[in-house]
């Protein structure tokens, strides 16, 4: 449905992909963070419940247990603990599966870092600066947890401070029309791995909507591989390479960078962001995508998912973005 609305906007000459802005926003899951179970607590509780089950079984074998435990329904007490043990075992399996995925990712990153350091050592004949990277640790950490109400949701930091059970909803918005071009939901609290999936979505939309000229995103999306991926897609990246100062000296706004620059994707990006044109274009980012999130939350009242599970939440976010696009299209037609 989103595609149909975008196609309609394109046919009405209300949508043109020039500058697009990508960002993410945390939305509450339909689950309480107090229903989360950590691996450390699950292990301790599992041991406690097993000990209680053994004790209840011994009591059941004692001839005078009714006299010593008046009112105690041993079969019910046993079943209650065994049910909890089954839930704990299932939760630990989920945590351990996630840990294996985490370990595989960290191991791949570790091997890349080691390979880069070895290549530099072979090229220069000197040891690279800094300490050698540490290999990732195996096994779940005590703080690794799963939510028993919505296992797909994650504990995430919120913009107002603190943490909540949430999903990270992503959207790419076109500058002039402010229509949502791509939308997806992720379980990752940070955004750095969300740019490549967006590029894949934009690539699939090219036959219908064309290709954006420029993609703007904040520093959460910045990595050398991401910048290179945007360039490879034929799009100019405008991704903050670091946090900017809130109150720079006034003269910095009018400085022109030197012509020399590092001839790499990240080097070209840093040079571009120092130019007057680059800074002016990047400044548009927060006026493109952030108002969309603000209106969705404050005006449309969507702050929390009603459904549970990543697949269903994805569909719900698509529906919200569709509602925004229909609303926005009505405004554009009236201009």
Regions found by a protein language model. Name each.
Residues 1-335:
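Anion-binding and metal-coordination hotspots
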């Amino acid at each position: 449905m989103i595609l149909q609305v975008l196609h309609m906007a394109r046919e009405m000459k209300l949508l043109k992909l020039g500058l697009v802005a990508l960002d993410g926003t945390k939305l509450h899951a339909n689950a309480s963070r107090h229903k989360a179970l950590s691996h450390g607590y699950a292990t301790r509780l599992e041991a406690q419940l097993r000990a209680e089950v053994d004790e209840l079984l011994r009591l059941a074998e004692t001839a005078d247990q009714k006299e010593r435990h008046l009112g105690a329904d041993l079969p019910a007490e046993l079943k209650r603990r065994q049910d909890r043990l089954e839930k704990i075992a299932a939760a630990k399996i989920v945590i351990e599966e996630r840990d294996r995925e985490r370990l595989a990712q960290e191991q791949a990153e570790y091997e890349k870092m080691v390979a880069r350091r070895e290549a530099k050592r072979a090229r220069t004949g000197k040891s690279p600066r800094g300490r050698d990277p540490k290999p990732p640790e195996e096994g779940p950490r005590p703080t690794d947890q799963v939510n028993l109400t919505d296992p797909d949701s994650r504990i995430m930091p919120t913009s107002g401070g603190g943490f909540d059970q949430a999903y990270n909803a992503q959207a790419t918005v076109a500058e002039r029309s402010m229509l949502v071009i791509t939308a997806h939901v992720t379980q990752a609290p940070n955004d750095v791995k969300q740019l490549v999936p967006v590029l894949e979505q934009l690539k699939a939309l090219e036959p219908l909507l064309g290709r954006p000229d420029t993609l703007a995103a904040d520093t959460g999306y910045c990595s050398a591989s991401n910048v290179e991926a945007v360039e490879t897609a034929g799009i100019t990246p405008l991704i903050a390479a670091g946090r900017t100062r809130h109150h720079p000296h006034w003269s910095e706004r009018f400085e022109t960078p030197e012509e020399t620059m590092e001839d790499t994707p990240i080097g070209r990006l840093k040079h571009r962001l120092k130019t007057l044109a680059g800074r002016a274009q990047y400044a548009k980012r927060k006026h493109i995508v952030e108002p969309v999130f603000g209106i969705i939350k404050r005006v449309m009242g969507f702050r929390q998912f009603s459904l549970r599970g990543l697949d269903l939440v994805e569909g719900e976010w698509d529906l919200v973005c569709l509602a925004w696009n229909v609303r926005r299209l009505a405004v554009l037609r009236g201009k």
